[in-house]
Design a protein with these regions (language model features):
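Boundary at the C-terminal end of the N-terminal hydrophobic targeting segment
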Residues: 19-23
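Bacterial N-terminal signal peptides
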Residues: 6-15
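Intrinsic disorder/low-complexity segments in short proteins, especially the signal peptide
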Residues: 14-17, 95
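Metal-dependent phosphoester/phosphodiester hydrolase catalytic core
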Residues: 24-357, 364-370, 375-410
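Positively charged n-region of N-terminal signal peptides that target proteins for export
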Residues: 1-4
């Protein structure tokens, strides 16, 4: 009888843990550690160390559920519990369903959905992009809803996500809740994210003590190559090079050497987008009497990174931090080049208060203090459509890039 009683208690404890895993989740978010055409990493955060790190999933066209179990750790210094399960061997461009912790019954409650990316670009691929996300919950909720309404394949988020400065777990709770609630399309499909680091992820803005300098960024996200600068390749057609503008890694040195090799090995990719936080061609924060592009960190980016962009060719560059809207003229060699210049898009105003913009910046084609996101369409024929969209849904600027990448130019 005593053994039976113990078994009942154990069963009830496990059942309670499973129920908690479903009902007390703070946030669910999808990322990639590798091939987005055949994998998906499911992450979720709650407060309970004992709940299982298990995901049940299936191709939405099939009846049978499979399970995968991953890892669990605390997002120190908080007590938030992070669970992470990488699903592999998935079919490209396919809708999948998943449930946390408990195998679904006939009713299949708590089901979420995601879609893998296509292996070959045989349809338009759409993503949203932006950064500097959450001064207030109202701001980030508005833009997350707008992003979901566009039904993108994924989101590219260029840093300053929760404005937690490496110390405030409560802001991450807000950010995770907002994304989980609102970054889902009308059919309940969750939008995966590609994330970069910004100064507000880091204690002091710049700090090379990894991961302690940015414990929540490194705790919440399993990054390709296990660092804040990395490449993510989408099938045979696109690559994103996510960089760290001197937040937890310096710009020159190892990161620049890695960038040179990463770009050289991706010459065959149709589309290639660098993504980073601090802008080379900004809209504010200029030294006294000078344009923003003359800030020392902007000069450092132009000195070490942009020569590689120009040498190998890119599709466009995403920059952030300055809390405005920006689209530059096509630029090459630090001057306008309408024939073969690079367009820089920014400046990080997803969900923040905006700032004034310079009226006489020679490199700016369009700049204004407006919260926005970019809606980007990669077309199979090689063109790129970029729409700038406000929280109310207004398309207030747009550009069509007629070449998939700028033509490489030898130094």
């Amino acid at each position: 009888m005593k053994n039976l009683f113990c078994c009942i208690l154990l069963f009830l404890g496990l059942q309670t843990a499973v129920v908690r895993a479903q009902t007390d989740v703070i946030g669910v978010y999808l990322t990639w550690q590798r091939d987005p055409t055949t994998t998906m990493t499911v992450n979720w955060v709650n407060l309970y160390p004992a709940t299982p790190a298990t995901v049940w999933y299936r191709d939405s066209r099939e009846a049978e559920w499979k399970s995968a179990t991953g890892t669990h750790h605390a997002a120190v210094p908080s007590s938030l519990q992070v669970r992470r399960v990488e699903l592999t061997g998935l079919q490209p461009d396919t809708l999948h369903e998943f449930v946390l912790a408990e195998k679904p019954g006939p009713e299949a409650k708590g089901v979420r959905r995601f879609r893998t990316l296509p292996a070959t670009l045989n349809r338009p691929l759409r993503f949203v992009a932006g950064g500097d996300m959450m001064h207030t919950r109202e701001y980030v909720d508005t833009m997350n809803k707008r992003a979901a309404a566009l039904e993108p394949d994924f989101a590219v988020l260029g840093g300053d996500l929760a404005y937690a400065n490496g110390v405030d777990a409560s802001r991450w709770i807000d950010w995770l809740q907002s994304w989980s609630l609102h970054a889902r399309d009308k059919d309940g499909r969750c939008i995966p994210m590609i994330v970069g680091i910004g100064n507000h992820e880091v204690k002091g803005g710049t700090n090379y003590d990894i991961p302690a300098a940015a414990p929540y960024f490194y705790g919440f996200f399993a990054l390709p190559e296990n660092r804040s600068y990395y490449a993510l390749d989408c099938g045979d057609y696109a690559s994103f090079l996510v960089l760290d503008t001197n937040h937890t890694h310096p710009i020159p040195g190892d990161q620049t050497a890695w960038l040179a090799g990463a770009m050289a090995s991706r010459r065959h990719k149709t589309f290639l987008f660098p993504v980073y936080h601090w802008p080379a061609y900004g809209t504010t924060k200029g030294p006294e009497g000078l344009l923003p592009c003359e800030h020392p960190r902007s000069i450092e980016i132009r000195t070490h990174w942009i020569p590689h962009f120009e040498r190998h060719g890119v599709s466009a560059v995403f920059e952030h931090d300055h809390h405005n809207y920006k689209r530059t003229h096509p630029l090459r060699g630090h001057q306008r080049d309408e024939a073969n210049g690079i367009t820089y898009l920014g400046d990080g105003a997803w969900g923040v208060g905006t700032r004034s913009v310079p009226k006489d910046a020679w490199y700016l084609a369009h700049a204004e203090p407006r919260r926005h996101l970019f809606h980007v369409t990669l077309n199979p024929e090689g063109t790129i459509q970029v729409d700038a969209i406000s929280g109310s849904g207004t398309v207030f600027d747009k550009v069509t890039l007629t070449k998939p990448r700028t033509t490489p130019v030898a130094p």
